[in-house]
From Swiss-Prot:
Protein name, UniProt field: Small ribosomal subunit protein uS14
Family: Belongs to the universal ribosomal protein uS14 family. Zinc-binding uS14 subfamily.
Gene: rps14
UniProt subunit comment: Part of the 30S ribosomal subunit.
Cellular component, GO, one term: cytosolic small ribosomal subunit
Length: 50
């Protein structure tokens, strides 16, 4: 079988940092999974209010 590239759907995008496909934060063009986002959100300028 030949491997094909996924062009659309949930598995088409991946985290820029670790490559994970689940739990992706796409808002504002971030494209990080939720785990990586929590680790570097403060460095990116996001603040936790509650």
């Amino acid at each position: 079988m030949t491997q094909t590239v996924k062009n659309f759907g949930r598995g088409a995008n991946e985290c820029k940092r670790c490559g994970r496909k689940q739990g992706l934060v796409r808002k504002y063009g971030i494209y990080l999974c939720r785990h990586c986002f929590r680790e570097i959100a403060h460095d990116m300028g996001f603040e936790k209010y509650s």
